[in-house]
Each structure stands twice: as structure tokens, then as C-alpha cells.
Amino acid sequence: MQMGLDFNLVEELVAGVDEVGRGPLCGAVVTAAVILDPRRPILGLNDSKKLTEAKRDALFDEIREKALSFCIARAEVEEIDRLNILQATMLAMQRAVEGLHITPKLALIDGNRCPKLAVPAAPVVKGDSQVPAIAAASILAKVTRDREMSEFELIYPGYGIGGHKGYPTPVHLEALARLGPTPIHRRSFAPVRAAWEAREGHSNTLI
């Protein structure tokens, strides 16, 4: 169902921008910007969180094939810890828009804030359920980040990262307390900081 999407917004060079990964305790925040081609409609677009993994994967390939322009960008863990998650997200969104090979007339940003851009921009609350280009951006960002988390599952076993994607689930928090943070954990986030300090304190006690 696409009842909330306004396909009139596909008629102009409108870029949709969205992010995935503000809430997790580990990994980058990933963003995407997409300019859809009104001559090549993509059926089934919706907020990525409302789609099955198989549907997201299929749309991921179709969006990349049919969009006039798209860019997937990111802010790394180091940037999140240095800037804070909000500013890092704004930076990643800025990178996504600047990475488009076509300059949009307007950038519509999912949420209630806009990054600093060289083009006109407007926030759209729940835009991934209303604006097709934002829905497309949400799919590109989520599939990209989810695949990265599945790879990290192999590099850092024991945390369940491939399942919870870095979000603070009971399984993740228990593993964090038991195993300590990995290099991909965000030490500016309270649960990670607490786990790090607990292990540091334990090490000092042993010394």
C-alpha cells in the first residue's frame, strides 16, 4: 500500500534524503539522497521499516537502476563520537546531497531538521511514508547499513550484531557488559561508555 505517498513530487528534480542508524550503539550512520525519474516509476516504494527484507533488497536494486541520481553517504563512529549523533547525521546527509551528480531543485529531508545545503531544502516529518524519493532514500540507506551489520557479525561474534543491527536490545546490552565495546561501538553513547568504564575499572583493580 502506498496511500500516503504523493507522486506529484516526482515531477520535479526533487531529492529525497533519509538516514538510518541514529539509535544504534555501534556502526556508522548511513544516509542516502535520491532523485527519482518520473518516466521510470518504481512500484512498491514505502518507508523501509514497513517492508520485508526481501522487498527492500529488490527495491534497492531497482532504485539504483532507475533513479536519475542517487548517493549513499555516511558518518563514521569517530565522527559520531566527536561531533554528537545529530551533527554527524546532518554531515552525512550533506554528503549524500553533495554526492548527487545532478543538482536537485529542492531537497526534502525526512524529519524535522535540515542540514546546511547549497540547494533549497525543507524538512518533512514522516517523509518516508509521504514522499516517494524519501522512501527510496530510506531503502538505500537501510539496506546498505543492514548489510554492513551482517558483515560485522562475522568480525565481532558474540554480540548478535547481525540480528539487532546495533540497536540497544537486551541481547546487545548483555554482550556489551560481558565482552566490552568493540572498535565499532560509539563510546559517546551512555551504555557503551558505561561498559567501557566498567572494564577500565576492572583492569585497574587487577593492576
UniProtKB/Swiss-Prot annotation:
Manganese or magnesium. Binds 1 divalent metal ion per monomer in the absence of substrate. May bind a second metal ion after substrate binding. GO terms for molecular function: manganese ion binding; RNA binding; RNA-DNA hybrid ribonuclease activity. One of its GO terms (biological process) is mismatch repair. Its main location: cytoplasm. Its EC number is 3.1.26.4. Its cofactor is Mn(2+); Mg(2+). A divalent metal cation binds at residues 18-19, 110. One of its GO terms (cellular component) is cytoplasm. CDD domains: RNase_HII_bacteria_HII_like. Belongs to the RNase HII family. This is Ribonuclease HII.
